[in-house]
């Protein structure tokens, strides 16, 4: 029998996962090469959601580009808006009113919270944790209600404007926000009770999809996925933009760089976003929410690159102006695209079951990948 076993040969097979698959979190296709259940090769096949946003921007005024940014990471529209309008303002040398800066921070951190809630809920659901799906989505609904109250939309918000924001917050906004922040710790405690300490969840995630700090840096990984590898790097602290230097908050880190830590780090970051929002509410000044800018902007000739700390990592905009009213060139550096590039590295050698965990833990949005 032993001799016969030694002569057994296995044959590798190729398996298409996606582009329509509940665990790919969008129209993403992975071509897996399998030896039994072991993953020996992963090929990322993207482009199914490519809409040509960068090219479309060349035929739109600077203000008309704003709605397109909502459709990058459509789970964090406020952050996309912020990164783009600050890029334009940087080239213009435009100063934004104080109240608008505080409102931008509040909306950006709410957007970060909403994105992290989708990640932790979806990852739990991918591992059949149906009950754990509900608490994050329950609280996320309240964030979307706040967005709708302010700008009339829930996902594609188009709230930021070059020089400020589209409108001031309505009278009931701050009480509703205060109520949400008071209830947020309960949701985090629920997730810790249902998932973080769950032995089955730990068995499925700890040590799975592990990436060390050196490799993460080599791939250009940023954001929560990098901080899960132990590096406390966050643009809000390292190179503060807007008014983030006025707030007191920590940068949570974990050290294992595996799927479990990538899940937990987002729960920890939710607490810090809530801290920032509370401070912004306390310091919120009166005043205008929009600087005086022409209806049709013409930027000076030049180029600029600006980065912000997005929900999934560093989000960057490279803008070239020829002196006209439309961008000559706009390039978007999207963290989901970078994070997806590391997926084969963390998946080869694991099992096909682990691949589902890895996709969920790196937290990609295909609108941002394909652009």
From Swiss-Prot:
Per UniProt, the keywords (alphabetical) are:
Cell membrane, Membrane, NAD, Quinone, Translocase, Transport
Where does this protein reside within or beyond the cell?
Cell membrane
Origin organism is Moorella thermoacetica (strain ATCC 39073 / JCM 9320)
Q: Show the PROSITE patterns listed in the entry.
A: COMPLEX1_49K
Job of this protein:
NDH-1 shuttles electrons from NADH, via FMN and iron-sulfur (Fe-S) centers, to quinones in the respiratory chain. The immediate electron acceptor for the enzyme in this species is believed to be a menaquinone. Couples the redox reaction to proton translocation (for every two electrons transferred, four hydrogen ions are translocated across the cytoplasmic membrane), and thus conserves the redox energy in a proton gradient.
Q: What is the lineage of its organism?
A: Bacteria, Bacillati, Bacillota, Clostridia, Moorellales
Q: Which reactions fall under this protein's catalytic activity? A: a quinone + NADH + 5 H(+)(in) = a quinol + NAD(+) + 4 H(+)(out)
For this UniProt entry, what is the primary localization, expressed as one broad class?
membrane
* The enzyme's E.C. designation: 7.1.1.-
Family, according to the entry, reads as follows:
Belongs to the complex I 49 kDa subunit family.
Which SUPFAM superfamilies does UniProt cross-reference here?
HydB/Nqo4-like
- A single MF term (Gene Ontology): NADH:ubiquinone reductase (non-electrogenic) activity
Is Cell membrane included in the keywords of this UniProt record? yes
Family annotation (HAMAP family): NDH1_NuoD (MF_01358)
Describe the subunit structure.
Answer: NDH-1 is composed of 14 different subunits. Subunits NuoB, C, D, E, F, and G constitute the peripheral sector of the complex.
Question: Coiled-coil stretches, from where to where?
Answer: none
Q: Supply the name of the protein.
A: NADH-quinone oxidoreductase subunit D
Annotated InterPro entries:
NADH_Q_OxRdtase_suD, NADH_UbQ_OxRdtase_49kDa_CS, NDH1_su_D/H, NiFe-Hase_large
- The gene behind this protein is nuoD
Q: How does it sit in the membrane?
A: Peripheral membrane protein
């Amino acid at each position: 029998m032993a001799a016969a076993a030694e002569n057994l040969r296995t044959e590798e097979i190729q398996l298409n996962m996606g582009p329509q698959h509940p665990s790919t979190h969008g129209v993403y296709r992975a071509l897996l090469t399998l030896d039994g259940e072991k993953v020996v090769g992963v090929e990322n096949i993207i482009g199914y959601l490519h809409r040509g946003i960068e090219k479309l921007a060349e035929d739109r005024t600077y203000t008309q580009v704003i709605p397109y940014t909502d459709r990058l990471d459509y789970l964090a529209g406020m952050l996309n808006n912020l990164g783009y309008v600050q890029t334009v303002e940087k080239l213009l040398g435009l100063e934004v009113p104080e109240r608008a800066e505080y409102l931008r921070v509040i909306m950006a951190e709410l957007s970060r919270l909403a994105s992290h809630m989708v990640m932790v809920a979806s990852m739990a659901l991918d591992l059949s944790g149906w009950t754990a799906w509900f608490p994050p989505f329950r609280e996320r609904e309240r964030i979307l209600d706040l967005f709708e109250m302010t700008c009339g939309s829930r996902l594609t918000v188009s709230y930021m404007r070059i020089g400020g924001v589209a409108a001031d917050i309505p009278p009931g906004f701050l009480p509703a926000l205060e109520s949400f922040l008071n209830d947020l710790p309960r949701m985090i405690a629920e997730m810790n009770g249902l998932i973080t300490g769950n032995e089955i969840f730990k068995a499925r995630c700890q040590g799975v999809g592990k990436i060390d700090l050196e490799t993460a840096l080599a791939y250009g990984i940023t954001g929560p996925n990098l901080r899960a590898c132990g590096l406390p790097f966050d643009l809000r602290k390292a190179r503060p933009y807007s008014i983030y230097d006025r707030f007191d908050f920590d940068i949570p880190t974990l050290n294992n760089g595996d799927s479990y830590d990538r899940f937990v780090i987002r729960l920890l970051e939710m607490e810090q976003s809530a801290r920032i929002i509370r401070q912004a509410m306390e310091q919120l000044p009166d005043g205008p929410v929009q600087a005086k800018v022409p209806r049709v902007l013409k930027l000076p000739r030049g180029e600029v690159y600006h980065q912000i700390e997005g929900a999934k990592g560093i989000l960057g905009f490279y803008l070239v102006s020829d002196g006209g009213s439309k961008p000559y060139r706009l390039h978007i550096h999207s963290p989901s695209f970078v994070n997806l590039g590391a997926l084969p590295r963390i998946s080869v050698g694991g099992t096909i079951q682990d691949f589902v965990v890895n996709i969920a833990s790196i937290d990609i949005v295909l609108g941002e990948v394909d652009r």
